[in-house]
């Protein structure tokens, strides 16, 4: 079992980051890979959850222990797997999630990708009172310089597709941001706010 890994951040993709330590490159699935953009080629520490499956060993990474705790609570709910849990973390700053659980707001929970009514109701039942000791989770890191506007928007769309959002939803988002200049991380944050409305 791993608690965290320290290493050099060598790669960022739409679905995962690669952390090199001890001559090995670890593929780590994270909620918003582009939130690590300002740390590329730097030594970082990332909190880890290790999942062993028959066909694979998977690593899930988090900025903070609280973010990891939210993930572990989410995957304890029947119907929520690691990918859905990462999508929820990416789309929410924890405040909305906690309020929705506390107020049994099933409609809010159903806005997350791949969360239907039954799973949303299960979340309310299983997660009530579980977030009391967890601080606000935010993947908000310092801004990075823009490489290329189209490339940044393209990367953001790829990351949102990886989180389970549908292509037709994302076409509207792409059109909305057409002609703007921002980082992939900021595009993702803005798009997630729009998708959660």
UniProtKB/Swiss-Prot annotation:
One of its GO terms (cellular component) is cytoplasm. Pfam families: HHH_5 (PF14520), RuvA_C (PF07499), RuvA_N (PF01330). Keywords: Cytoplasm, DNA damage, DNA recombination, DNA repair, DNA-binding. GO terms for molecular function: ATP binding; four-way junction DNA binding; four-way junction helicase activity. Residues 148-197 are annotated as: Domain III. One of its GO terms (biological process) is DNA recombination. Residues 143-147 are annotated as: Flexible linker. InterPro entries: DNA_helicase_Holl-junc_RuvA_I (IPR013849), Hlx-hairpin-Hlx_DNA-bd_motif (IPR003583), NA-bd_OB-fold (IPR012340), RuvA (IPR000085), RuvA_2-like (IPR010994), RuvA_C (IPR011114), RuvA_C_sf (IPR036267). Residues 1-63 are annotated as: Domain I. HAMAP family: DNA_HJ_migration_RuvA. Belongs to the RuvA family. Has three domains with a flexible linker between the domains II and III and assumes an 'L' shape. Domain III is highly mobile and contacts RuvB. Homotetramer. Forms an RuvA(8)-RuvB(12)-Holliday junction (HJ) complex. HJ DNA is sandwiched between 2 RuvA tetramers; dsDNA enters through RuvA and exits via RuvB. An RuvB hexamer assembles on each DNA strand where it exits the tetramer. Each RuvB hexamer is contacted by two RuvA subunits (via domain III) on 2 adjacent RuvB subunits; this complex drives branch migration. In the full resolvosome a probable DNA-RuvA(4)-RuvB(12)-RuvC(2) complex forms which resolves the HJ. The RuvA-RuvB-RuvC complex processes Holliday junction (HJ) DNA during genetic recombination and DNA repair, while the RuvA-RuvB complex plays an important role in the rescue of blocked DNA replication forks via replication fork reversal (RFR). RuvA specifically binds to HJ cruciform DNA, conferring on it an open structure. The RuvB hexamer acts as an ATP-dependent pump, pulling dsDNA into and through the RuvAB complex. HJ branch migration allows RuvC to scan DNA until it finds its consensus sequence, where it cleaves and resolves the cruciform DNA. This is Holliday junction branch migration complex subunit RuvA. It comes from Streptococcus mutans serotype c (strain ATCC 700610 / UA159).
């Amino acid at each position: 079992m791993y608690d965290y890994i320290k290493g050099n951040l060598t790669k960022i993709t739409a679905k995962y980051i690669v952390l090199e330590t001890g001559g090995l490159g670890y593929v780590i699935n994270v909620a918003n890979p582009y939130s690590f953009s300002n740390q590329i080629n730097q030594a970082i520490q990332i909190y880890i959850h290790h999942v062993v499956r028959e066909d694979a060993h998977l690593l899930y990474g988090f900025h903070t222990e609280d973010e990891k705790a939210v993930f572990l609570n989410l995957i304890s709910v029947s119907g929520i797997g690691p990918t859905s849990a990462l999508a929820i973390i990416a789309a929410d700053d924890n405040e909305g999630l906690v309020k929705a659980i506390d107020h049994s707001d099933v409609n809010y929970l159903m806005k997350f990708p791949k969360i239907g009514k039954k799973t949303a109701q299960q979340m309310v039942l299983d997660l009530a009172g579980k977030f009391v000791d967890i601080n606000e989770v935010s993947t908000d890191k310092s801004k990075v310089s823009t490489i290329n506007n189209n490339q940044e928007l393209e990367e953001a769309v790829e990351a949102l597709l990886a989180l389970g959002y549908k292509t037709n939803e994302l076409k509207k988002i792409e059109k909305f941001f057409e002609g703007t200049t921002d980082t992939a991380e900021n595009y993702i944050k803005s798009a997630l706010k729009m998708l959660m409305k």
